[in-house]
Every structure is written in C-alpha cells, then in structure tokens.
Amino acid sequence: MQTINRLDDLRQAVDSLKNGGKTLAFVPTMGALHEGHLTLVREAARRADHVVASIFVNPRQFGPNEDLDAYPRRMATDAALLEAEGVALLWAPTVDQMYPDGYATNISVSGVSEVACGAARPGHFDGVATVVCKLFNQVRPDFALFGEKDWQQLAVIRRMARDLDLTQPHVDRIIGVPTVREDSGLALSSRNQYLSDTERAQATGLSAAMRRAIAAIEGGAEVASSLAELTREILAAGFVSVDYADLRDAATLEEVVRFEGRPARLLVAARIGGARLIDNMGVGPQ
C-alpha cells in the first residue's frame, strides 16, 4: 500500500491505478478506524479493481467548542489495518495541503444540511461538503462509499454530487453501507472511545429505545408522542441530553409529522459522558 501526502504524488498514483481502464472505489475517513470502516473497505473492494482510502481530520467540520483537538489520531495503526484489507493507496494530506494560505471557497448545501445535526452544529455540513468535494476531485473515484450511520451526511453528499453534476463519482455510485453494530446494538463509532465501561453499557439503551419507537410508529402510534417517549427513554438510560429525535423522509430529510408508509428515517443525537452519539434507523419500507 502506498501512503501519499502530496497532491502531485496522488495524481500520479491515481493515474497509474486507473491505467488500462481499472476502476477505483474510494473510502474517505477521519481515521480512528473500526470494523464499520473496514466493512466499507471490503464493500469497496467488491465493487472496483482498486481501493483508495483517505485519512484526514477535517477542521472545517468541527465547531469552536467541539472535539477537534481530542479526536483520536492513530495513523500508524490505521494504515496497518487498511494495508491488511488490501487497500492500494492511502491519501493522508496535511491541513496545509487541503487548505493552503488564501483558501477562500466553501460549499453549502441548503435544505438537507440545515436540520438535525445541521441545526445542532451550524456550519458542520458546509465543512463536510467542502472537504468531500475536494477529495472527490483529488481522487477521481468511480465509486465512493459511506456508512449509513450518518444518514444525513450521506444525503448531503448525494445532493451536492447531483447539484454540481459530479461524474467522479456520479451520484448513483455514491454508495451507502448499512450501519455496523455491536452485539448490544450500539452503533460502531470512533467516538465510542470516549465512553467509560459504565457509559458504554448505558449507551446500548439508545438503539433499544429507537427500535421501540419505530415499532410504535409503524404500528400506527402518533409520531409526536412516540418521539417524546423516545426522548424520555434515552434520558432514562443515562444520557445527559438529547440534541434531537426526528422522523424524516429518507430522501429529502423533510420532517414527517404523520407516518403514512413512505420510506423514512428515525434520526437521533444524544450526549453521554464526553461523547455525542448519533444513530438512525429505517422506518417503513427502505
């Protein structure tokens, strides 16, 4: 596996990998890799001739009081995991490489980026859209793979790709991969490392409460009362606050006030200990 830090070197390496019409699948990450990331890598390998991964902790998607400095960084360990999975190339740019002096461009995707995490973390998805667009332009992949755990991020990236007429990758080749969970139901996340043993045990209550809410909504219960009960259950499990618990259209992320059978997603963000955990699950046919 090649590990590359300079854009000129990346372009040459990508050209070499694409030689002879070979295809590339891209898995962008912020490092602190876990089984969820490796699942993306394996799906990428199934879809293309070569897999390219990136590790870049993007400062533009962190707010002023968020965990940029504390976010786990373990490049050597992560690189070894990617190499063991057969990744051909690791793109690991510096902040100065991605945002040199004088950098002045920002991508903002209205609508889908303004609710849920977008409302709780202003500017977050501008940072996500900007860095992902840059990474797409740098790597020029045929496919890009993202975890469905951050459903809103996936929706923002697809909207951006569609609106900007991106072809590498085309929006239809931006692939969402189902959330990987522990046996307890807790969604895998790099931020789970912040949890103590007690907090991790309490955090399992999130997915259980979400499943109960989904069963109620699909069974005909009122959406508003089901979400209110979900919030109460999350707090009772040991979470200190709930940023949001929303039912939204799976494609547009518009609020669903009355569930009528169209594909929807239950999206939740809640805080426990020093961690802000997000999760989502499908409601109705997917």
UniProtKB/Swiss-Prot annotation:
Catalytic activity, EC: 6.3.2.1
Top-level class of the enzyme under EC nomenclature: ligase
Domain of life assignment: Bacteria
Residue ranges the record marks as coiled coil: none
Protein's UniProt keywords contain Hydrolase: no
Compartments in which it is found: Cytoplasm
Additional notes on this entry: The reaction proceeds by a bi uni uni bi ping pong mechanism.
Function of the protein: Catalyzes the condensation of pantoate with beta-alanine in an ATP-dependent reaction via a pantoyl-adenylate intermediate.
Protein name: Pantothenate synthetase
Organism: Novosphingobium aromaticivorans (strain ATCC 700278 / DSM 12444 / CCUG 56034 / CIP 105152 / NBRC 16084 / F199)
Lineage, broadest ranks: Bacteria, Pseudomonadati, Pseudomonadota, Alphaproteobacteria, Sphingomonadales
Gene: panC
